[in-house]
Design a protein with these regions (language model features):
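Bacterial N-terminal signal peptides
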Residues: 1-8
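Catalytic and substrate-binding clefts that recognize carbohydrates or anionic sugar/phosphate headgroups
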Residues: 14-173
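Signal peptide processing junction and immediate N-terminal pro/mature segment
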Residues: 9-13
Length: 173
């Protein structure tokens, strides 16, 4: 059933299938796209490679969808209506990131005016979502490539200039 659920989502999402969906921690799911190669996108976020600890819960609803545009890897995740989104690193503006577009690339910005302050000294390919009922989830896009993080009210998008990458979704009570 889970495999069919993921196939439906990837077929709808675009041209990159999800190769592997694995429970790697307590309510932590790893999504690996077809074509992922650790030598092209080594992890700078993980201390060690995760290992499967069990089956993905049947009621899992936060599903990464992968696409590729002109050879550049992308991932997106639909989020429940009314979700508040936070993250992306050091950027100017409000902490609430809904409706924001953040460039993720670490360089010395020099002035807050460059790129509208959308990238200062640290970028984090991480989003924290808080649902209207107060429950929360997190999404880690495990890529070091130059990227853009778009946090719409119904979807999180992560568009890179590089190779396919893994995503991790943490959804705990």
């Amino acid at each position: 059933l889970i495999a069919m659920l993921f196939e439906v989502h990837t077929a709808f999402a675009g041209d990159v299938k999800t190769e592997k969906v694995t429970l790697v921690g307590t309510r932590i799911v790893e999504f690996v796209p077809e074509g992922y190669d650790a030598s092209r996108t080594p992890s700078l976020m993980l201390v060690r490679e995760p290992k499967k600890i069990g089956e993905v819960p049947l009621n899992w609803t936060l599903i990464s969808q992968f696409t590729s545009v002109d050879g550049k890897a992308n991932a997106s995740l639909n989020v429940p209506a009314g979700t508040s989104l936070y993250g992306g690193g050091e950027v100017t503006g409000p902490l609430l990131r809904n409706g924001q577009k953040i460039k993720l690339w670490n360089t010395d910005n020099g002035m807050y005016r460059v790129d509208g302050g959308s990238r200062l000294y640290q970028t984090h390919p991480w989003v924290l979502g808080v649902r209207p009922d107060g429950t929360a989830f997190g999404v880690l896009f495990d890529s070091f490539w130059k990227a853009e993080l778009i946090t719409n009210s119904d979807k999180i998008e992560f568009n890179t200039e590089g190779a396919p990458f893994r995503t991790y979704v943490i959804d705990r009570k």
